Amino acid sequence: MIDKYQEPKHHQLRIGLVSPQQIMAWANKTLPTGEIVGEVKNYRTFSYDRDSETYKPERDGLFCERIFGPIKSGVCACGESRKIGDEKEKRTFCEKCGVEFVDSRIRRYQMGYIKLASPMAHVWYLKRIPSYIANLLDEKIKDLENLVYRDFIFAGPLTKKPTLLRLRGSFPESKTKFSGSRDILSQFLKTKSFQKLRDREFSAGAGAIRKRLANLDLEVIIYSSLAEWKKRKEQKAEIEIKPTRTERTEEEDRKIEKIKRRMRVLVRRMELAKHFLETNVKPEWMILRLLPVLPPELRPIFKISEVQFISSDLNTLYKEVISNNKILSDSLLGCKFVPEQLLTGQEKIVQVAVDQLLDNRISGQPRRDRNKQLYKSFSDILAGKEGRFRQTLLGRRVDYSGRSVIVVGPSLALHQCGLPREIALELFQTFIIRSLIRQRLASSVKTAKKQIREQERIVWDILEEVVQEHPVLLNRAPTLHRLGIQAFQPILTKERAIYLHPLVCKGFNADFDGDQMAVHLPLSLEAQAEAYLLMFSTQNLLSPGNGDPICVPTQDMLTGLYTLTLGNRRGICATRYNLWNRRNSQNERIDDKHYGSTKGKELLFCNPDDAIGAYRQKRINLDSPFWLKVTWGQHRIVSKELPVEVHYESLGTHHEIYGHCKIVRSVKTERHFIYIRTTVGHLFLDREIEDALKDFRARVV
């Protein structure tokens, strides 16, 4: 349970780039002796201790207790135990082994790091589409991959520093006299002077990319990309100035497509540079200098027999990185000269090992086990339906939640959902108990629970009151975007299914063929305010991806509207303007016998209720045309349509006949009548629109 009187430790979860200093801050610990631990230097996991006849973690290894914490709470690697104190108390360490006396649960979140001998590219930002590194540097992905894997090199600009021709003074005097240029070159390639020249004038690998990323000016990138985008837009307009597509040649069409692709690249580059500026993230962090090591509990190892262990695939991939990185580090720091080809090959091996650890599927050389199965990399553990986010974090059962099948609720408002009473009774149980005790309807919590269990009438009344002021959250897995979870006002139903308005189905990507949805209850006032202001379905009418309307009528709705408004399209001319085919000005009762004899003739009704009553008595069909008399104050004809014919009578009355209506005007009485040719379906639709407008006006007022 979260203590509401204590400031929560974590407010949000964000995935992104971090600096090397932050990675070190996560892992480093300072021992009382002044030694800093946190770097994983040994690729071994456990070793057999003959004294205790048990397996213990290797020092500075992947399961080191000094780095990640003790395996048993309060027990160090030496076997000494001490009482675990509060987090606010001073940290205590073992004087012999340097293990901190803390709870063993620290091994679930304490991290380590691997110090890479040379910078390595992060495969997520290099090989994934779109490639962020390629977008920022405005280079091709293939060229950058060749550079990372040492197939290409960057040649630096000319400087005023010594070059090859002026480095003769770097040799000892006794070795400057050689008979031939080949001997001079071979001797020079083995000196440190050549290494300095190579590092200054040429660069390869991820280190070269890191230098270019560090020298980028993001504001200049934004302005230059915008200027080029405007220039490309003008070029595109010059080609498209021709009125018809047939006048353009195939070459011009190819130029237009090429310009469009370039404009899309420029837009992505500007957005990426703007994102780096807003988040205060440096682009060179996409090149790794320190590789984080996950806590041991997230990559466990199990003992199944005396000599057999089962380990996570991550441990195998970490071992490969550490062992190859150690070889590279020894080669770079060694006193002996190492040929450039060996260094290049070893750096490429380390880069491949890092790629396999981060994402084994998109790495150039995926690593497999004995059964030819791919090792599960860091990306495989996070992504997918069985990944850590969807299965362990998002897929876990939580309190104050329920689940049921969804069915269509066309009578609901857009912000409402039908919630089964059984689910609501369980979700709002604590609120009902509090209300029963406050109103002195129950003397204790036990008595209130008994009343809820027996489902007394007062319980349902209180539930109705509580539900009116409390929103609920509906979620359908998988939650691919923010519209996958929305807030609704619950309406209690006696059924066991959740009723959902059909217009919100597109946001959830749901249909009514047996889909299930989860119900969550926001508890705090902040969560309820967020649900009302941001998460209500009426606040999410547009798609967050492209801004298009997401609450659009479905095919069922369009078919229903078509059927509802389907009628005789022949118009008034089909009856030769004869409004009185059926002499029924007084709206007399039409029995079945008479109605059968008037087949093909159109009836007249003085008000909509009589027409709807005749439909319910099956006197007319849903699409049967009839004449409806309305007063001038209720409807006004606003149209530029000219009358088909005008009839003038001797008593001063004249009839203006239009396509689907007839207006009767009287000069003496100044009375106006309108006869509309319509159907019952149109009446139903008109009433629904009027009710919706009345409800909208009431809420606005």
Curated annotation (Swiss-Prot):
**Which InterPro entries does the protein's record reference?**
DNA-dir_RpoC_beta_prime, RNA_pol_asu, RNA_pol_N, RNA_pol_Rpb1_1, RNA_pol_Rpb1_3, RNA_pol_Rpb1_3_sf, RNA_pol_Rpb1_clamp_domain, RNApol_RpoC1
Give one Pfam family: RNA_pol_Rpb1_2
Enumerate the residues binding Zn(2+).
Answer: C76, C78, C94, C97
Q: Which domain of life is it from?
A: Eukaryota
Using the UniProt record, give the first listed, main subcellular location.
plastid
Query: What's the EC number here?
Result: 2.7.7.6
Which residues of this UniProt protein bind Mg(2+)? D511, D513, D515
Per its Swiss-Prot or TrEMBL entry, what cofactor is needed?
A: Mg(2+); Zn(2+)
Q: Which GO terms describe its molecular function?
A: DNA binding; DNA-directed RNA polymerase activity; magnesium ion binding; zinc ion binding
Please tell me one Gene Ontology term that the record gives under cellular component: DNA-directed RNA polymerase complex
Question: What is one process in the GO biological process aspect for this record?
Answer: DNA-templated transcription
Q: Which UniProt keywords apply?
A: Chloroplast, DNA-directed RNA polymerase, Magnesium, Metal-binding, Nucleotidyltransferase, Plastid, Transcription, Transferase, Zinc
What are the subcellular locations of this protein?
Answer: Plastid, Chloroplast
Q: What does this protein do?
A: DNA-dependent RNA polymerase catalyzes the transcription of DNA into RNA using the four ribonucleoside triphosphates as substrates.
Q: How does it assemble?
A: In plastids the minimal PEP RNA polymerase catalytic core is composed of four subunits: alpha, beta, beta', and beta''. When a (nuclear-encoded) sigma factor is associated with the core the holoenzyme is formed, which can initiate transcription.
Family that this chain belongs to: Belongs to the RNA polymerase beta' chain family. RpoC1 subfamily.
What is the protein named?
A: DNA-directed RNA polymerase subunit beta'
> What is the species of this protein?
Pelargonium hortorum
Q: Which gene encodes it?
A: rpoC1
